[in-house]
C-alpha cells in the first residue's frame, strides 16, 4: 500500500507502518488511525481500500509529509543561516546546534577527524 509516495510494509501494525512516512511519528499515526476509526494493532495488509482512502485523505488535508515537510525544514535552517543568529552560524559551520560540547565528541556532526601535524621536538645537542 502506498501513502504519500511511500510503500508501507504490509506485515507491520498500522501505527508503526505509518511512521515510515517522513513527517508522521507515533503520536500523529495514532491520531490519524483514531480519526479514521481503525484499530492501531491492525496490520496494513488487513486494511481494505476504503480504510486506506480514509487514511490518505486525513494525511492530505491535515499533515505536511515527505517533500513538503523536508522543504519546510530546509527553509527554516536556511532562514537561521541568513539572519546570522547563533544557531544559523552553528549550522553553517557544521557544529552541534543545541549546546553540546565539542572539544571531545560531536563526531557525527563534525565528520571524520582531520589530522593536524604536531610540533616537532627540538633535539638535544
From Swiss-Prot:
Keywords associated with the record: Ribonucleoprotein, Ribosomal protein, RNA-binding, rRNA-binding, tRNA-binding
Xref: InterPro entries: Rbsml_uS13_C, Ribosomal_uS13, Ribosomal_uS13-like_H2TH, Ribosomal_uS13_bac-type, Ribosomal_uS13_CS
GO cellular component terms, A-Z: cytosol; small ribosomal subunit
Gene3D superfamilies: 1.10.8.50, 30s ribosomal protein s13, domain 2 (4.10.910.10)
Positions of the UniProt region annotated as Disordered: 92-125
Described purpose of this protein according to its UniProt entry: Located at the top of the head of the 30S subunit, it contacts several helices of the 16S rRNA. In the 70S ribosome it contacts the 23S rRNA (bridge B1a) and protein L5 of the 50S subunit (bridge B1b), connecting the 2 subunits; these bridges are implicated in subunit movement. Contacts the tRNAs in the A and P-sites.
Subunit relationships: Part of the 30S ribosomal subunit. Forms a loose heterodimer with protein S19. Forms two bridges to the 50S subunit in the 70S ribosome.
NCBIfam families: uS13_bact
Descriptive protein name: Small ribosomal subunit protein uS13
Organism, scientific name: Chlorobium phaeobacteroides (strain DSM 266 / SMG 266 / 2430)
Amino acid at each position: 500500500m502506498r501513502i504519500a509516495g511511500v510503500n508501507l510494509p504490509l506485515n507491520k501494525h498500522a501505527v508503526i507502518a505509518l511512521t515510515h512516512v517522513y513527517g508522521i511519528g507515533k503520536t500523529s499515526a495514532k491520531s490519524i488511525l483514531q480519526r479514521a476509526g481503525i484499530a492501531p494493532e491492525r496490520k496494513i495488509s488487513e486494511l481494505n481500500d476504503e480504510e486506506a482512502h480514509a487514511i490518505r485523505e486525513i494525511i492530505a488535508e491535515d499533515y505536511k509529509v515527505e517533500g513538503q515537510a523536508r522543504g519546510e525544514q530546509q527553509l527554516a535552517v536556511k532562514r537561521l543561516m541568513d539572519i546570522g543568529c547563533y544557531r544559523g552560524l552553528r549550522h553553517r559551520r557544521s557544529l552541534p546546534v543545541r549546546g553540546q560540547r565539542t572539544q571531545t565528541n560531536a563526531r557525527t556532526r563534525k565528520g571524520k577527524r582531520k589530522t593536524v601535524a604536531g610540533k616537532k621536538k627540538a633535539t638535544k645537542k
